[in-house]
Every structure is written in structure tokens, then in C-alpha cells.
Amino acid sequence: LTRSKNEFVPIDPEGKVVKWYSCGPTVYDDAHLGHARNYVTIDVLRRVLAGYFGYNLRFVQNITDVDDKIILRGRQQYLLADFKSKNPTVTDDLINTTIKAFDAYVKKNLPLLSADVNIGTFNEESGKQYANVIQGKSVDGVGPAGDKEAKIKMHLKTAGTAATALLAPSKSTPEDVDIFYAGAEDVLLPYLDSLYGTSIDASDHTVFTRLTQKYEARFNEDMRSLNVLDPDVVTRVTEYGDQIVTFVEKIVDNGFAYSTSDGSVYFDIEGFEKVPGNHYARLEPWNRGDKGLQADGEGALSQQKTSEKRSDADFALWKSSKPGEPAWKSPWGPGRPGWHIECSVMASDVLGEQMDIHSGGIDLCFPHHDK
């Protein structure tokens, strides 16, 4: 909060117990080097506090296993498996569907390309339109590359790989089919979800837990390979549905949140700040009005605007579940937790009203950690 060095004094009157909450992974994919850097750094600090300073640490780490990314990836993997079972060979129908998927992917993610770009012209045109990015520069060629350019490179690779698979001369053997799907699946995944995602029976939570359990296990394996200590306590969002509902009800009762007609509940930033001493966006106040970060924080499935929000900056504490999304019972109707409220509930349940240390990725300071 102070962005400076301060003396560390535990809440414990005897100065021995340190309560620490570490924001854990959202388990929809494998961990990457950014995760490794984060959790190894936290582990070093944890070992120093316990081993050198002799504090008695209570280290809690969560697993986010309900999230827009998880819902999308779980649905997509389910739909792709079903699609592959119905299309075990590369037919004209499969090719045509994949071309449509390619076109949709390029249109959404690579807007500098012309509307008539196709699998045959993709490499040449993308090389021209995104030359600066390919050369390691910013899109406009003025400044250095950043996160935006990294995502563009990912999209270029995905589309290029799919184009190569579609242009491959032979697709007849089982090995050819495997190679085709390996190259095309990243454009097929979002396309199939756009067609059939809302038709999935989301009451069957195994569509999603099959994904999260797999990647939680892989994350733990990676951390142990890096010699990162296991948490003392692990919490999972799926195990906290009732507590989250109760927590949100208290916020509504306190006058800091409101429900909308679709069954969602939003935090009322203006109402919160009307109370003397309450301030919002303490970690990165300069990002308070960043609509891009706000949208990222709300998730890919929550981009539809509602006129009932009192402010565009108000964020979801509880989201009404749409077709194809998992749901839990609540006073506002079937829904699921908003991303930002989850850690508040789990941390307070295990550690109480106050904690000594809260750690997590710097990229999520605003809006996630500020909630």
C-alpha cells in the first residue's frame, strides 16, 4: 500500500504467528514461467520468515476452480472431444467447418488483416500487416513490445498452424488425422463453443472439474519439481459456494452491493466510498479508470453490458448463470461467484478478519487484488 519498505509487525500480540494468504492458480491450463517466478519468489520469502526469523506461519493458498476461463475451456474441450468422435476422418465437411473456424478466429483476433484473407494468403498478409510485431516491436513500430504484442504473436502462431494443417496434402492415415487436429484444434475450440456452448448440460459439473482436477495436479507436480513447499491449507472455490452466498448477502445488507433483475449482484463502489475512511483502488489507484483491466477482471463470459449497473466500474460479486454455465443456488437465483469475491471469502474463513501477508501476481494488482 505504501510502495516503500516498512517494518513488518505481525498482528499476533506475541509476535510469533503470521497469517499468510497466497493467491493461487486458476487451473484451466499448464503453469508457465510467470507462475514459476511468482511461486518460487513467495516460497523463498516464506522460508526466510520461518527458517531465519522463526515465525510460526499459517500459509493458505487457494485454487480457483470456478472462473470464466475454466468454463470456456471445459466446454471447449468437451465439445472438441465430441466433435472428434463424430469426425474420425478428415472429410470435406470437416475441412469446411475448420475453414469457418479459421476465418472466425482471424476476424476476431487479428483485425489488421483484410476481410478476404484465407488459408492460402494468411502467411504473406500477416507477415506484412504484423511485421513490427514479428520483429519484436510494438504494433505501431514506435515503442517496445508488451503484453498486447505477445498475445498477437500467439494468435499469429495459432492461425498459422491451422492454415498449415488445412493446406497439408495428405490427411488420409490415422497419423494424418492426429496431425490435422493438433494443428487445427485451437481455432476449432472457440468456434465449436460459439455454436454449441450454451447447449451443454452444465448441471453436470464434471464437464468442468475434469479440467480443473487435471491442471491442479499438474500445477502441484510442477511446484514440487521446483522444490516449492506445499501450502499448509488449500482452499477451492467449488467447496465454498454456500459461504460465498452468505458473504455476498452481508455486503448487500451493509449497503455496499445491489442485485439486478437478471440475478447478478454488483459491488457498489460509490456507496462504499460514501462511508468516511473507505477508499477503492488502493494498490494501483492510477488504474482505477482503466476499462480494459476492468473488463478483463469481469471475464470473457461477462462482457454483455447491463443498464442496471449503477456504474460501469462496479464489479460482479455474484453472476447469474447463463445456459452452458455451472450454477449454485442463491437468493438471487442460480448463479456462480464473481472472481474477485472468492479469495475474500476463503481467506476470512481460514484466517479470520485480518491477515498479515497477502501475496499474488503483480499483473493482477488491479482489479483483482484490490477487491
Predicted feature locations:
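NTP-dependent nucleotidyl-transfer catalytic core
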Residues: 1-371
